[in-house]
Design a protein with these regions (language model features):
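Aromatic-anchored segments of alpha-helical transmembrane domains
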Residues: 254-266
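Non-transmembrane functional regions of envelope-associated proteins
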Residues: 1-138, 171-251, 256
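Substrate-access "cap/lid" subdomains that shape
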Residues: 124-168
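Loop-to-transmembrane alpha-helix initiation sites
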Residues: 268-271
Length: 271
């Protein structure tokens, strides 16, 4: 299987360079994807993964950072664990790609998927309205919003093990394993619509949707479609308002159609 570690290690080990050397050797024996983060306080650019770009330039649509906090440890892949909180401070969507120094950098979950199938790069498609989709060969197309973000969900259960349980009885047969920290004061949980989640839980959530092709996403045409449907229904109700025998059935039918359409869009991963 493919292993990933969401613990950030941007600085040398305070116990000495020997500890970093031991970690580097361990990563040579057991390849893993490491987590990096894009930062407004960094100026250097991290390791770059090749990208096949289709359509326009995606840089103008992506979240941009001046630098990437990085380390020199051996790793088969590196992915970013940055989140993008909404106006209320709650994280509901995560970017799959960000920009820095004129280059593209994939998220941790996307990098886990790329390394898992052994592909040297991933594909990104950009249209006039923004980022349209990303793709790892052998897996479904990943539809995103115009900024390459997808929605996270809170209804997925994962098999979990503590470090002590893993040492006594290591997990076997898993295609992907993500290691994270839950110690208070060491890592801060991320506020989400489903409650506080640890970074490795968010990445596991995104990875699950990427593998199954079920990541909820709001297409760029969704706001215009919602406005158009609302105006059409209002116009129909205004025309039939003086005839209750017409307006009542139309109103009930409209409510039912909106509920059915919303459920269908959600099940189709378009909402």
């Amino acid at each position: 299987g493919t292993a990933g570690v969401t613990v950030l290690m941007p600085d040398p080990d305070i116990r000495g360079a020997g500890q970093d050397a031991q970690l580097a050797m361990a990563l040579l024996r057991n390849p893993a994807v490491l987590a990096y983060t894009a930062s407004n306080q960094a100026t250097q650019v991290g390791p770059h993964v090749g990208t096949a770009q289709l359509g326009g330039d995606p840089q103008e649509w992506l979240y941009q950072y001046p630098g990437i906090l990085r380390t020199q440890h051996n790793a088969v892949g590196v992915g970013l664990i940055n989140s993008s909180p909404e106006l209320d401070g709650v994280v509901r969507r995560l970017p799959l790609v960000v920009g820095s120094g004129g280059k593209l950098f994939p998220s941790f979950a996307l990098e886990m998927l790329r390394v898992g199938v052994g592909d040297p790069s991933y594909q990104i498609s950009t249209k006039e309205t923004g980022i349209e989709w990303l793709r790892i060969p052998s897996f479904p197309v990943i539809n995103t919003d115009s900024n390459s973000r997808i929605w996270i969900t809170s209804n997925i259960n994962f098999h979990r093990q503590t470090a002590a349980e893993f040492i006594q009885q290591p997990m076997e047969g898993a295609a992907f394993v993500i290691f994270g920290v839950t110690a208070e004061g060491v890592v801060n949980p991320v506020p989400t619509a489903g409650g506080a989640k640890y970074p490795h839980e968010l990445q596991a959530n995104v990875l699950h949707h990427l593998i199954n092709g079920t990541s909820p996403v709001q297409p760029v045409w969704a706001p215009a479609a919602e406005l158009g449907v609302a105006l059409l229904l209002i116009l129909i109700l205004l025309v039939t308002a003086s005839h209750v025998y017409f307006s009542a059935p139309i109103f009930i039918t409209s409510i039912g159609a909106l509920i059915y359409g919303s459920l269908h869009a959600y099940e189709s991963s378009y909402l």
